[in-house]
Amino acid sequence: MRIADYSVTKAVLERHGFTFKKSFGQNFLTDTNILQKIVDTAEINKNVNVIEIGPGIGALTEFLAENASEVMAFEIDERLVPILEDTLRDHDNVKVINEDVLKADLQTRVKEFENPDLPIKVVANLPYYITTPILMHLIESKIPFSEFVVMMQKEVADRISAEPNTKAYGSLSIAVQYYMTTKMAFAVPRTVFVPAPNVDSAILKMTRRKQPLVEVKDEDFFFRVSKASFLHRRKTLWNNLTSHFGKSEEVKNKLDQALENAAIKPSIRGEALSISDFARLSDALREAGL
């Protein structure tokens, strides 16, 4: 019997008198086939260390521990720590850390792996309400995570993996794809969770690029420009950029010059620009002194 078997999950929750907290976005997976598919998608083996976020009662952790060298699981809800100690007692390669991963000193934590030189993968069923902040925090950290295999709201997975000229494409697509290649692995129905969420889920596989997708002179400015360009989706690039940078004649002249130098029409919308277009645009705007 597995932790994820519905009867086992139910028994564990009852034994420990656990009640779900909405504020933590807790939905526990009760489908062993999906858990095995997650591990297979992530290609977990004994030459890989894993960081898991939000292990819950250990359903995914159990599968990871059987396949990985070590698992470091960050759980923000202190009520789940004794439950995890109970459900994972047979796995001595799991370290449960009662900490908010957004506040954790990850640089120090990853040195606590017995074999810290092994590749580190992030495999997680992320709380939906905080998926994007956690993902960007991990991607932008200086830790060379080789891969992320993450369950998230399908709508967010669509946005991350979206191509230009689609409704889902936006600054989040650019922010992630700048660092990672993305692949939608498979969909997960809401019926396989306890309690069932109000949305459908998907597993997204993200692999770190050896080099960022495009070369830019100032990364922070590049991301600032891409965010500004999607400020109001229905507005033109020109309108969004003037809303962000200002509407003085001096600013407008600089914008005009930058757009001309980047060979980008002011009348198009942000969603029509590729990531390389945004790289050209941000460099031109920076050069213009904006």
From Swiss-Prot:
Which function does this protein serve?
A: Specifically dimethylates two adjacent adenosines (A1518 and A1519) in the loop of a conserved hairpin near the 3'-end of 16S rRNA in the 30S particle. May play a critical role in biogenesis of 30S subunits.
Q: Name one GO molecular function term.
A: RNA binding
Q: What is its EC number?
A: 2.1.1.182
Alphabetically sorted, this entry's keywords are: Cytoplasm, Methyltransferase, RNA-binding, rRNA processing, S-adenosyl-L-methionine, Transferase
Q: List the disulfide bonds.
A: none
* Substrates-to-products reaction catalysed: adenosine(1518)/adenosine(1519) in 16S rRNA + 4 S-adenosyl-L-methionine = N(6)-dimethyladenosine(1518)/N(6)-dimethyladenosine(1519) in 16S rRNA + 4 S-adenosyl-L-homocysteine + 4 H(+)
Q: Name one GO cellular component term.
A: cytosol
One protein family per Pfam: RrnaAD
Q: Where in the cell is it found?
A: Cytoplasm
Q: S-adenosyl-L-methionine: present as a keyword of the record? A: yes
Where is this chain primarily localised?
cytoplasm
Judged by the first EC level, this protein's enzyme class is transferase
SUPFAM superfamilies recorded for this chain? S-adenosyl-L-methionine-dependent methyltransferases
Check the record and name the SMART domains matching this protein: rADc
UniProt name for this protein: Ribosomal RNA small subunit methyltransferase A
Which family is annotated?
Answer: Belongs to the class I-like SAM-binding methyltransferase superfamily. rRNA adenine N(6)-methyltransferase family. RsmA subfamily.
Q: Which HAMAP family is this protein grouped with?
A: 16SrRNA_methyltr_A
Gene3D superfamilies listed in its UniProt record: Ribosomal RNA adenine dimethylase-like, domain 2, Vaccinia Virus protein VP39
Sites where the protein binds S-adenosyl-L-methionine: N27, L29, G54, E75, D100, N125
